[in-house]
Structures are given as C-alpha cells and as structure tokens.
C-alpha cells in the first residue's frame, strides 16, 4: 500500500553518556516554552527478571530527567523485537510494575508510556487500569506487528514480524484511541492521550484531537516530510 512502511530497524542505541550529552545539548538550544520529551527503553539481558528490567527503565528515565528532559516517554512496545521490553504493554501486571518504578524515579516529571496495537479490548483495559495510577499520558499506536509478503506472496524478512506504519494502520489507530478515550471518560481519569501511527495530514490531527488526544506525534510521515508539523501549525487544521 502506498504511504505505508514495513519498519525493521529495531531499537539501536549509543552508550548512555552519548545520548545524555545529546539531550543536554538539545535542551540548551530549545527556545523557552518548548517541551523536550525523551524516549527511553530498557536493555534486557538474557535471564533478567521483570524487576531487573524495571530497574533499567527507571535508571534510564532518571538519566534523561537529569540531562534536561522536560518529560520522559517510556517505550513499552517495539513491533520489530521479541524481547520483553518490546511486548511489555501486553502484560498488564509487568507493565504496572515498571510504570510504578518509573514514577518513583521521576516523581516530578511528566511520564508518558508508548504502546503498540491491542487486538483485544479487555487486554487493553487491563493495561490501562494497571498503569493509570502512575502515568500522565499514553502514546499510541507504535506500529502494528505482522508478517510481510512481497508481490509474489513470499514472506519477507525471513518470515519475522515487522512493524507496519503509515496509512495502512490509520483506522486501527483511531479505533484504539476511541477505546482508551472511553476508558478515561468512564473512570474520570486524568490520563491523557497522544495520537501517533498512520497520521500524516491536517485532517488526521483534527480527528485525533476531536477524539480526545492532548497532542499528536508524527513518525514515518515526518521522515517523508520533515516540515509537516510546521506546515500544519502554520496553515491550521
């Protein structure tokens, strides 16, 4: 489908000191009033317990805050990896434990969690109830994981699942946003939503905000058009 991507680069990272310096440099160059959100994720080692994974998340969040982040976005999903950090949002108990540790690490900073696609509304609700006491916002949807075939029907990427982004997932994103907006409304929760995934034009921004989103992020759309956000802000929606 035109305008859609099969994303396969995982979550590579430089050593912590490198990105800590980068965050500090970025913060020093931002104009007053700009909000710097830094995305962090754990790096699980083979055999790590969920408590050890939570400690790594918390450590990275504290590093980000100490380096100048105004808020921290913890990545609980990556559709291109099979490790626990990439699927954390699908395990409500583990997600709640990690969210609690993150909140302890950065008690005075906004905490956002980025999640992937839920296929089951009850699983989504269990996740929401587990993390809602600890977070300020949820960011969704971080791609849809599926196998990809070429024009001849042959599996690509050695049959491994990849994250699909772009136009192909837009309807799924709005459906999931509607679920979570309902959870928030029914429980009078203060958790806010940030829309991402499949959004690439002014009309998408308007629809996401109309469904209760506090803000909208661009991912693959901004790779194709780095000036997209500025253009929408300038021209309105």
Language model features with spans:
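Active-site entrance/lid segments in N-terminal catalytic domains of soluble metabolic enzymes
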Residues: 1-130, 134
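Glycine/Thr-rich beta-alpha phosphate-binding loop at enzyme active sites
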Residues: 79-90, 127-189, 231
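Short catalytic-loop micro-motif centered on adjacent basic/acidic residues
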Residues: 111-114, 194-195, 217-218
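Electropositive phosphate-/nucleotide-binding environments in soluble metabolic enzymes
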Residues: 13-17, 51-54, 170-174, 202, ...
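Glycine-rich adenosine-cofactor-binding loop
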Residues: 190-191, 195-200
């Amino acid at each position: 489908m035109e305008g859609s991507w099969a994303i396969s680069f995982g979550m590579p990272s430089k050593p912590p000191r490198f990105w800590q310096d980068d965050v500090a440099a970025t913060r020093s160059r931002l104009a007053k009033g700009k909000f710097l959100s830094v995305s962090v994720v754990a790096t699980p080692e083979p055999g790590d317990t969920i408590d050890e994974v939570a400690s790594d998340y918390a450590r990275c969040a504290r590093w980000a805050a100490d380096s100048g982040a105004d808020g921290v976005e913890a990545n609980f999903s990556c559709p291109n990896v099979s490790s626990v950090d990439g699927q954390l949002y699908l395990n409500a108990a583990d997600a709640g434990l990690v969210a609690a540790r993150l909140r302890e690490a950065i008690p005075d900073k906004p905490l956002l969690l980025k999640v992937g696609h839920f296929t089951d509304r009850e699983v989504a609700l269990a996740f929401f109830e587990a993390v809602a006491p600890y977070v300020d916002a949820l960011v969704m949807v971080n791609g849809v994981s599926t196998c990809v075939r070429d024009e001849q029907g042959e599996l690509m990427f050695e049959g491994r699942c990849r994250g699909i982004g772009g136009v192909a997932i837009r309807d799924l994103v709005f459906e999931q946003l509607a679920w979570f907006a309902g959870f928030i409304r029914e429980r009078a929760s203060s958790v806010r939503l940030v829309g991402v995934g499949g959004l690439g034009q002014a009309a998408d921004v308007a629809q996401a905000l109309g469904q209760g989103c506090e803000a909208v992020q661009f991912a693959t759309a901004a790779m194709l058009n780095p000036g997209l956000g500025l253009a929408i802000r300038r021209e309105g929606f």
